[in-house]
């Protein structure tokens, strides 16, 4: 379906708005993916906080032109799918990686994070990033570790003193 000028402007405006809020962008080739497979992927994307869109490359280049994702313009060749991580930086990476395991037709083409263009192989790195909740749990564990070690040391010292006192008490009473 051909879009008129006003519809194209709306698409560019929408994509630019999403790009300014997104943490990361993955561009992937989707040629050969069936409609039911794409529908399942879109459903999975909505559930994981990923904005998934198939847009003409010319419109995408215009939309991304004034954002940190302008670095990806040189990779916009052929039919592409744009996956923006809205909630955490690794969400789109996990989605694309998981979906491409089941469907070999989906191939990542480029990754952009923080205004830097990375090769397609960096999808695995992006997918391995912890979610916000996982990162907070790791931070809490790291912060609580010294306190836990200190408490264990105090307990061990108290146990040693009580054992020493229990062992030395009978000897002193005999002497």
UniProtKB/Swiss-Prot annotation:
Which UniProt key words apply to this protein? Ribonucleoprotein, Ribosomal protein, RNA-binding, rRNA-binding
GO terms under biological process: translation
This molecule's function is given as: Forms part of the ribosomal stalk, playing a central role in the interaction of the ribosome with GTP-bound translation factors.
A single Gene Ontology molecular function, please?
Answer: structural constituent of ribosome
| NCBIfam families xref list | PRK00099.1-1
- One GO CC annotation: large ribosomal subunit
Assigned protein family = Belongs to the universal ribosomal protein uL10 family.
* Record's protein name: Large ribosomal subunit protein uL10
What is known about its subunit structure? Part of the ribosomal stalk of the 50S ribosomal subunit. The N-terminus interacts with L11 and the large rRNA to form the base of the stalk. The C-terminus forms an elongated spine to which L12 dimers bind in a sequential fashion forming a multimeric L10(L12)X complex.
Which HAMAP family does the protein's record reference? Ribosomal_uL10
Gene that produces this protein: rplJ
